[in-house]
Amino acid sequence: QRQMCIRDRIGSACSMAAAALAELHGMELDQIEYAAEVAMEHHLGLTCDPVRGLVQIPCIERNAVAAMRAINALSLANFLTYTRKISFDVVVNTMYETGRDLFSKYRETGEGGLAKYYTGKK
């Protein structure tokens, strides 16, 4: 049974993008880690509910939103690193635990979430 899916792929990609942006902006290591942590933590609990089993809705749109989140995480890291309470490692472990706890119908099955309610009719 799948434990990880879209939240992990998009969360990881967003996290890597935020860290890369922070590095390119010459930030310190703790700011880079904070950017990565903020980017990933906002994907915890995201359902994987591809409509009709395709990745158009909502997956591709979620990737676009994640790109903007990476930029937002960079901004937050620039100003709020000193206030951080949670480490990147804690967020990664929480992502794993959340994936294990999430009902299977929300794990790339097309049985829950948006996939359950979309009929294809207008």
Where is each model-derived feature located?
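Functionally critical mobile loop/hinge segments
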Residues: C14, A19-K122
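Glycine/charge-rich, flexible interdomain linkers and switch-proximal surface loops
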Residues: D8-R9
